[in-house]
Amino acid sequence: MKYDFTEIEKKWQAYWEQHQTFKATEEPNKPKYYVLDMFPYPSGSGLHVGHLEGYTASDITARYKRLKGFSVLHPMGWDAFGLPAEQYAIKTGTHPRLTTETNVANFKSTLQRMGFSYDWSREINTTDPGYVKWTQWIFLKLYEKGLAYVDDVPVNWCEELKVVLANEEVDEKVNDGYTVVRRPLRQWMLKITAYAERLLTDLDEVDWPESVKEMQRNWIGKSVGAELDFYLAGTDEKFRIFTTRPDTVFGATYMVLSPEHPLLDKITTDEHKSAVAAYREEAERKSDLERTGLQKEKTGVFTGSYALNPATGKEIPIWTSDFVLMGYGTGAIMSVPAHDERDWEFAKKFGIPIVEVIKSPHSVQEAVFAGKDSVCTNSENAEISINGLAYEEAFEKITDWFEKKGLGQRKVNYKLRDWLFSRQRYWGEPIPIKHYEDGAERAETELPLNLPEVSAYQPSGTGESPLANIAEWLYGEDEHGKFRRETNTMPQWAGSCWYYLRFIDPDNPNEAVSPEKEKYWMNVDLYIGGAEHAVLHLLYARFWHKVLYDVGVVSTKEPFRKLFNQGMILGEDNEKMSKSRGNVITADSVMSGYGADAVRLYEMFLGPLEQVKPWSTNGIEGISRFLGKVWRLVYPNEADGTVQVTDDAPSETVLRRMHKTIKKVGEDTETLKFNTAISEMMIYVNELQKEKCRSRTAIENLLLMLSPFAPHICEELWQALGHEESITFAKFPEYDATLAKDDVVTIAVQVNGKLRGTFDAAAGLSKDDMIAEAMKVESVIKFTEGKEIVKQIAVPNKLVNLVVK
């Protein structure tokens, strides 16, 4: 019987759907495992082989955990609001909902062809009214807690898209060639800053890649420092700055205000007004990222005014520069060029004095010294001296002095800014707020508030969405009076902030999620997706989760226990897959040629899951041959189609290899080392072929190990071996530790604790024999010859240590 992957895969996909094989249930007597993919935005271009990597990894884990006796939740849905569908609507007039439905059907078809074991009964779509209702409900919880508010803020305005971008989105859009400028606009903000410390400290509770944790820590940007007051020279007026290095205040030789600082107009002298105004206008056109880049050329304008350094009493010039942001600290800084790289470059460019106040190993006129591992110098006045003090002691002493004089206080600052939440687009969740003629603001009482139909999708360009043009939707009257609805919509991030909760209870009309189901399934045990979401989706979702924890909706502090970032699969040319490069390999085309099982195995066999690696269509041929070998273990003669398996016990050789394979595959699958698990199964299959093994035990255990990776062929062969129930409900085999031991082990030989050689020996060699063999190792003899051996230590199967004198 021939291995016909096309028919076999269709057969088993239909079987799984008909029997709802992967339907998740809450079973109190079983451990649970919640494995989740970052659900996709259903774009028009469909899925290529790179997209499938993370989905394949999560599916292997889900199938493996079922075999290990877990009740598994493995859902899939669609993050379906978003700009691309709206841009397409603007061009073609096609409603974004229709475009999205077509794209979802295309995506779903590919995922089903891959044999992923999703519980499709839990499928969700962020644009469905039943889902929008609860996204809006969560927004109102934020609103009730004072965490959602309106403000006129300088925003990142993209002229081409006619939309406001969150700080976190600017970099991507600029790289895509869009122009982003700063302009003030009425916006909805979410007070994520209120959760900054919790977002920071709770990172210690999750099993995430350290690189992602570090990205979040840097984005939150906690700075411990002090706020200090500086007087304007010749006045009684003072202004406050924030610094993380109050110990360097004696070296402050100039001040810098943000171009948006409210004091700037007041202090700028007449002769400098036009230059300052022009500079401010230029700064408004730049994003925060452009303004603060360390590599950018330092620019600035002198205001004509001076401040008094409170430590030295000297007048120092006040400048304005765009690298100081109004949103961080106080929007004003003291500049210590000797000990800060940016300040040093600025001072050098504009001829400002540089004064050493931290003892440096070189001249600070030639290069900056920014280290903390030295002591203060040139840092005293009539009231205080911090000379000779190291950083921490100097920090405390000078800050105490400022506090006693009423000129400062200790302060913790965060770089994290409140989340700019509103969008001036049509295709998003309407913000459920009504604005009344008397100035009052009230929440919508009937949710969901659905989007109305519109005839044109173009953003207005005025700061309002196309919803502002739908009078019958926009205006209304209730018992409180006449109102106008909010025309801003939510960003795409809103729906993805909590979708993992809705998967737990997708059809509940009365609650976002029932407490009983939430307690059973949360948190997500394994979350797989790209590292590019580190400071966007992952931070936002953690914020919403903490709010939901505070209002009693969830029982866990964190949503995702373990996070794994898969590496990118490149095109065959070693470049990122993209239409423009013409190197995209679609998932459907490869499946048509080789079958889903081969694609799944090859995706995982390419290399470690976390690494970047190129695709090779030639490479999948080897995987295809491997599956042919597996098939022929059960059907050795294609012509007669008879199962040729015996009930004979495996030979000793096969038995040992089988137990080693069970051990290795189990351990590697647990730790997501899928490439080495597959290698081990290949070795096992070769052993079975070599030994001409037809043992049912040996072959069934192979199918159980292989089924999470290549489920269709394993289901077919499992059935051929006489099993009526899906292999999904079988149990992963257990290994015998004695039989799984290596036959040969490498023993390290140390002399006085230093490695001097190794030798190979049979596993289980006695301690005396280990010591005897160690004494024969040539590289060891020269360290023991002519010396007294005072102690001999042997650790079975590992090492021998000889102590000599």
Swiss-Prot record:
Catalytic function, reaction form: tRNA(Leu) + L-leucine + ATP = L-leucyl-tRNA(Leu) + AMP + diphosphate
CDD domains tied to this protein: Anticodon_Ia_Leu_BEm (cd07958), LeuRS_core (cd00812)
Short sequence motif named 'HIGH' region, residue ranges: 40-51
The keyword Protein biosynthesis is assigned to this record: yes
Binding site for ATP: K579
Disulfide bonds: none
NCBIfam families from the UniProt entry: leuS_bact
Superkingdom of the organism of origin: Bacteria
Native organism taxonomy: Bacteria, Pseudomonadati, Chlorobiota, Chlorobiia, Chlorobiales
Record GO cellular component, one term: cytosol
Sequence motif: 'KMSKS' region, positions: 576-580
Family according to the record: Belongs to the class-I aminoacyl-tRNA synthetase family.
Chief location: cytoplasm
Main enzyme class: ligase
UniProt-recorded Gene Ontology molecular function terms: aminoacyl-tRNA deacylase activity; ATP binding; leucine-tRNA ligase activity
Biological process annotations from GO: leucyl-tRNA aminoacylation
Keywords on record: Aminoacyl-tRNA synthetase, ATP-binding, Cytoplasm, Ligase, Nucleotide-binding, Protein biosynthesis
Protein name: Leucine--tRNA ligase
Compartment(s) where it occurs, according to its Swiss-Prot or TrEMBL record: Cytoplasm
Its EC number(s): 6.1.1.4
Pfam families cross-referenced by the UniProt entry: Anticodon_1, tRNA-synt_1, tRNA-synt_1_2, tRNA-synt_1g
